[in-house]
Amino acid sequence: MAWVTRSPLIQETPVKSRREFIRSAAGIGIGLAAGLPEALAQQPAPGAAPATGAAQDLNLVNGRIHTFDARNSVVSSVAIRNGRIASAGNSAPARTANTRVIDLRGRTVVPGLIEGHVHIVSLANRPGYHTILENTTSIREIQEALAARRKSVPEGQWITSMGGWHTNQWSEHRYPTLKELDEAVPDRPVLLYERFTGPAITNSAGKKIFDALDAGAPVHPDIKKVAAADNGAIAAAGFAGGGPAASALFHLRRTQTFEDKKRSTIDAMAYAASVGLTAHLDEVLFPTPGPLHPNQILSNLDQYRMYDSWLALHREGKTIIRLQMNFLQNQNDPALPELKERLRNQFQFFGDDMMMTGSIGEWAAPLGAGAVWREAQRLVAEAGWRNENSVQNLAALQQVVEAYEAVNKQYDITKLRWMVHHVPEVTPDLLNRLKAMGCGVQMGAFRWVTSNDPKVIVGPPFRTIADNGIQVGIHGDGVHIAPLNPWLHIYFAVTGVNSFGAKVNGDQQLTRQEALRLFTRGNSWFLRMEDKIGSIEAGKLADLVVLDRDYFTVPDVQIKQIKSLMTIVDGKIVHGVL
């Protein structure tokens, strides 16, 4: 039997009146049932823990299967044998006594989506029982999601939601209050933590714990007080030096066990599968080696230990999505000791198709480090490694292009697949210069999250970049500053509309076909796996998703509500059932 997951991160609840909601939350909790608003119903209710097993021979028939091959063929059937696509066409595939036939009944099937720039390993390390709130649109939906999560959380354990959401996404454009959190979860501590540094919010049970910790002997000589306000608010920390939200995070992290991390890792994989994400290029972010410290923020993890729970599950045969791990080097030291040792002693692209090392990304040294950063680019080229740099404006992109050109005069990088990520601004000249060096552009589709001024164009210029002919992909940059759910970012790419309903990206929209192609076949190039994943073609690994609605025909707003009815990875059904 394959690993089949039903993610516990969001759970389905009936829509109730406010009085019914409060009464049930204060009693035994809200039962699981159908009928949760579409923004919340991103995966089925939780089931039993999945079990390992080999891929099954499958025939998927009577569907609308978008292959994303060179001709964008749409076929009706797919045969899967030994974890690979055996055929994709319009004739009934051959079958044996051991073949399972699944009637798609006209449903839409697409290749498994690929995240070309993400921080999913950070999600796998979240403390507490993390609850996905990135799909909620109001305080009421937040309450329903938390109350539903409560049902599967043991008494005394923290219910958390850390990163991936922003108050812009909620109709009230504010945090829930302590009272509102109490209405949802009166008997377990709750902590919601925004982006990298907070601020955060807790309920009465959580405030009681934090108040006691503040009043007691310090658990670390450098810790600051959480100082939760009467309304549950916890002030943001700084990027360095700690602060109230970082102290709250530290208290949860220091009690997290390895089994807790394995559970969080399983939850992260299950949620990804539930929204159709089957492969990820992880970008680390702000690596911080050594023991936990109260100054560390949500994006600080030990880059040498953060993969331990994922590796353990991989050894047990329990990983259900693909992971490629990049190495971010964040040193300003002119000697670049860590980068040099990494390039000298690490293998890039080492592992198997379910879990392997990547290369350098999302940078080899901080972009603002001047000569140190330029030397880091040279060292990566000298070692023959793939390289990435994330840029936040046109000046940074100009700096990267000039550095790549300088390095390319000394070492040929044209076959190494060097990249630039995010790219909110661009010029045709810079694109052409990148293309001449064999580079690719990963377009960040996440700026709708913080956009609140309809007069400000947020980028990236999807249309300009896609029309250039350079190798291109699209990403969401979850799970700190943006959601993991790819459909929220695809919606922005095809509409240019932010959370306030304002069009904030000019005329830079992609077609639906283009956007999804970039999130599948396009992104496979950035993982060096275009011959294995990204399209539904004979010989490729069997990663595909049966959607709950037709992405190509539903109204724009429903794109954000798409979820997977069934996700197949490596020929195994890892989410849902038909």
Regions found by a protein language model. Give the residues of each.
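Divalent metal-binding segments
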Residues: 29-31, 50-61, 66, 70-341, ...
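N-terminal secretory signal peptides
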Residues: 1-20, 30, 34, 40
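Signal peptide processing junction and immediate N-terminal pro/mature segment
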Residues: 38-48
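Acidic (Asp/Glu)-rich catalytic clusters
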Residues: 344-354, 411, 434-436
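Internal alpha-helical transmembrane segments of multi-pass membrane proteins, especially GPCRs
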Residues: 23-26
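Non-cysteine beta-strand/loop elements that form the S-adenosyl-L-methionine
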Residues: 352-362, 439-446
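His/Asp/Glu-enriched, well-ordered alpha-helical/loop segment
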Residues: 378-388, 392-418, 422-424, 428-435, ...
